Amino acid sequence: MYKAFLFFILWYNQRLFVTSLSQNSPSLKEIKICTVMDQAGYTPVSALGEFRLIDRMTEKFSSYHEQVVRGIGDDAAVVKTADGMVDVISTDLLVEKVHFDLSYVPLKLLGYKSVIVNLSDVVAMNAHPYGITVSVGVSNRFPVEALDELYAGIHQACQQYKVNLLGGDTTSSKVGLVISITAIGRSKEEKIVYRSGAQKNDLICVSGDLGGAYAGYLVLERERRVLLDKPELQPD
């Protein structure tokens, strides 16, 4: 009896689902299923670059809420809050073999960096970051201890900058390690600094060693190539 009832529920839900698809989905003639890489006349993403691609993907989107002061187009979005302040929201995605190489990047350092690159966007808008969400896609080649190391770096960054971990998501991945972090900050609306606010003769101040990170990257890449060619040189 129970199995028959369960089958009926599944059958009925499937009917509702198919009906919904037929009423709300485009017709098959409107759906193009193709492998883009095999088709002539398509534009490669590299031909546009990051910002032109973002403009193209988002040009049809509108703002439906008056509390959204600034959406796409700056370091972070700006949203009014009930207390007269604004929340500043930014997100970044880090993908293995694109943004980092685990052959020379320690997981703890990667966790720390993944937080910092998001907090920097909030700070660039002259807001004070107070929270982050962390979403991780991880393949089965990573043991629990590896994730412990990753989150140790995330925890270190949260401690250093007094930022709360607000939540996130964890899922499996077939392409290695993927990290997505959203950072949220707060400021007075009149204190927000936009990219468009830069003026001629403004003073630009920087800290640290300009080009130091890139120089270090070149050294690490050189050493990685050497070890691939001569694995016997790998240190104990």
List each language-model region with its residue ranges.
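Helix-biased detector of long, well-ordered alpha-helical tracts
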Residues: 16, 30-236
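Serine residues within intrinsically disordered or low-complexity segments
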Residues: 20-27
